């Protein structure tokens, strides 16, 4: 399959103001098979960010107290610390159904509050059908 078959054309992307390429040579992707490997790599990358760097994320269930490695920090502390260092932290988290229905309403709200208190921005997104959800997880 040709590279052009994998990516949208500039017209299909629909954002003529963007100068971001859809592809670049020498890209590297490393599969992280287990959650502990993922969280350890995430912690290393986020801790290396400095003022003016960007951290964008989406989340379905944002447990702010989830530890990224033994002894901490939690995901909330990790992202809040980045915001406190001047990293531009922006998140889009699913605005969960009520906790009474065994969902993650409080956790998602608390993750956003912790990051926003440190200077980041987290929006709760509920653009779904009734009873639906955004099952999304992404960090850039």
List each language-model region with its residue ranges:
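HKD-type phospholipase D/PLD-like phosphodiesterase module
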Residues: 6-51, 63-140
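Structural motif
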Residues: 54-58
């Amino acid at each position: 399959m040709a590279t052009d078959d994998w990516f949208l054309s500039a017209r299909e992307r629909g954002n003529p103001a963007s100068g971001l390429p859809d592809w670049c040579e020498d890209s590297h992707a490393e599969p992280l098979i287990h959650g502990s490997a993922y969280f350890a790599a995430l912690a290393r990358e986020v801790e290396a960010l400095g003022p003016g760097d960007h951290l964008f994320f989406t989340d379905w269930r944002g447990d702010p107290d989830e530890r990224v490695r033994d002894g901490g920090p939690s995901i909330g502390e990790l992202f809040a610390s980045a915001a406190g260092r001047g990293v531009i932290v922006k998140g889009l988290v699913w605005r969960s159904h009520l906790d009474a229905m065994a969902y993650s309403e409080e956790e998602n709200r608390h993750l956003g509050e912790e990051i926003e208190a440190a200077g980041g921005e987290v929006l709760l997104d509920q653009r779904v059908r009734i009873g639906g959800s955004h099952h999304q997880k992404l960090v850039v």
